[in-house]
Design a protein with these regions (language model features):
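Periplasmic c-type cytochrome electron-transfer domains
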Residues: 2-7, 17-189
């Protein structure tokens, strides 16, 4: 056994030595700038010109991400299928939605999703703000019938009225379905 290990070590040294060549001693490395950018550290926040991130939006988005009132049965939140405790993904083979209905796929992670070129497995949403709105009205997922019903539930809550006003200051009517998506998107960014 010792002889084999010694032989393997000598072969390894011989191969390592074969890769060395005399010269200036400096390695010349050419790196494509696109490749370098692809492997650089991710930014702390994925910036969006259309949805500047603020602390108030993040706070509202966090609250909405865990809000079960966004589902028809008042029992499913974004976190139900994108569990932050499971790295923002679903732990099952397929996602379970309204009244136990099974989705066609499992939910992709929301971690770093704002850096993706498109959302959903099929790319049908351009950004996390648009993606956040889809499952709420999907009859298999959260099953709300329409955006006005979703917003009616939130308008009935004084705390949400104040949080939307703080997150979208200066807007005449900050409590909109689009702003719901912007807030969740800010939290995911």
């Amino acid at each position: 056994m010792r002889v084999r290990m010694l032989a393997a070590g000598l072969v390894g040294l011989a191969l390592a030595g074969a890769g060395c060549k005399k010269g200036s001693g400096e390695a010349v490395v050419q790196v494509d700038t696109l490749q370098l950018a692809a492997f650089s550290p991710l930014p702390e926040v994925m910036v969006s010109q259309a949805n500047p991130v603020t602390d108030a939006k993040i706070d509202l988005g966090r609250r909405l991400f865990f809000e079960t009132q966004l589902s028809a049965g008042n029992n499913i939140s974004c976190n139900s299928c994108h569990a932050l405790s499971a790295f923002g993904a679903d732990t099952g083979a397929v996602s379970i939605g309204h009244q136990g209905k099974k989705g066609g796929r499992n939910s992709p992670t929301v971690y770093n999703a704002a850096g993706h070129i498109a959302q959903f497995w099929d790319g049908r949403a351009a950004d996390v703000e648009a993606q956040a709105l889809g499952p709420i009205l999907n009859p298999v997922e959260m099953a709300m019938p329409a955006a006005p019903q979703v917003m009616g539930r939130l308008r009935g809550n004084a705390e949400y009225r104040a949080l939307f006003a703080a997150a979208f200051p200066g807007e005449r009517n900050p409590l909109t379905y689009e702003n719901l998506g912007r807030a969740i998107g800010a939290f995911e960014r």
